[in-house]
Regions:
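Basic, short loop/linker segments at the boundary and entry of helix-turn-helix/winged-helix-like folds
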Residues: 3-46, 50
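Short helix-capping/linker segments at secondary-structure and domain boundaries
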Residues: 50-56, 134, 286-291
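Polybasic low-complexity intrinsically disordered regions
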Residues: 56, 60-63, 81-241
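Short small-residue beta-strand/loop micro-motif enriched in glycine and branched aliphatics
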Residues: 69-70, 196-200, 289-291
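Helix-centered, glycine/charged polyanion-binding patches within enzymatic domains
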Residues: 222, 228-291
Length: 291
């Protein structure tokens, strides 16, 4: 739904207590900059999920779009959280293991309000490109191993690991259809009727789309639409265990091409499944290409 409608049907104050409880720190006395409202920061994360935005793109779009400002109750001239502030808020929630809890609460409200009918689900994945980093050969070797380079962990004169804060050690390279991507993948489960995202997972850009299926599909899904990247014996068995009807596209192989019947079946399935591409298409065309 439009952001204005979403803003009306969601009781945002329900999120304040779990967020403030998770992020509470003992006050260190007067002084310092006032913190941004926690509900506004959470709404920024909802915008990121809705529009597949990186932290950098998020800051730009909030400054650029009137609809975003209205959704966040910001007036022209109000200070907007920068990309590092958005990243830090996300990291805090993730470290306290409350991100998924908050998103589930958000989805429950959409279902309660009748906006999401749960008549079927669509899954897909999309790249979220982030700025490419200039690291030394040794640093990149450590990052590929999943280790933090020693150079990143050095403390500055204030006792802080400022270089580590500025570096992204989780983003990865991936090539697809001749294009190189550096960053992450958003894996989403969206309601087939409204196209509202109800579950999500984030990985680096490197893993195959299907690797996150167990994190975005569960017993609440009764019908699943997906492209052939999600077609495998293991996934079909997984869906059967969940009692979820599979509408995953059939897959052809080099010596075993699709039959005419399978092609026709895929064409019928595409009428619903392609709606998930509309989500990513909208994200890409209306948001990222504006940068």
């Amino acid at each position: 739904p439009p952001l204005s409608k979403l803003d009306k049907v969601i009781n945002w104050e329900l999120f304040r207590e779990p967020i403030e409880k998770a992020l509470y720190v003992e006050p260190k006395g007067a002084g310092g900059r006032p913190a941004f409202d926690k509900i506004m920061m959470f709404k920024i994360l909802i915008l990121q999920k809705y529009y597949n935005l990186s932290d950098e793109q998020t800051e730009f779009q909030i400054n650029d779009r009137t609809s975003f400002k209205q959704f966040l109750n910001l007036k022209i001239g109000d200070k907007v959280p920068d990309e590092k502030t958005v990243w830090h808020f996300k990291e805090q929630l993730a470290n306290k293991n409350v991100s998924q809890q908050l998103f589930n609460l958000f989805t429950e409200q959409l279902i309660t309000q009748g906006i999401v009918a749960k008549e079927g689900s669509m899954i897909d994945a999309s790249f979220v490109d982030v700025p490419r980093q200039r690291n030394s050969k040794d640093d990149n070797a450590d990052i590929k191993k999943g280790a933090v380079p020693l150079d990143f962990a050095k403390k500055d004169k204030n006792g802080k690991m400022s270089k580590l804060f500025q570096k992204d050690t989780d983003a990865r390279w991936m090539s697809k259809s001749g294009e190189r991507h550096y960053g992450y993948k958003d894996h989403i489960n969206a309601d087939s009727k409204t196209k509202i995202i109800t579950k999500y997972s984030v990985s680096s850009a490197a893993p195959h789309d299907s690797t996150e299926i167990e994190n975005i599909v569960d017993e609440t899904d009764n019908k699943l639409h997906a492209d052939s990247a999600y077609r495998s014996k293991e996934i079909e068995e997984f869906l059967k265990e969940l009692k979820c009807e599979s509408f995953v596209h059939e897959r052809g192989y080099r010596n075993n091409p699709l039959t005419d019947e399978q092609k026709e079946s895929n064409n019928i399935k595409s009428k619903t499944r392609s709606r998930v591409e509309h989500i990513f298409g909208f994200m890409t065309n209306s948001m990222n290409d504006a940068l």
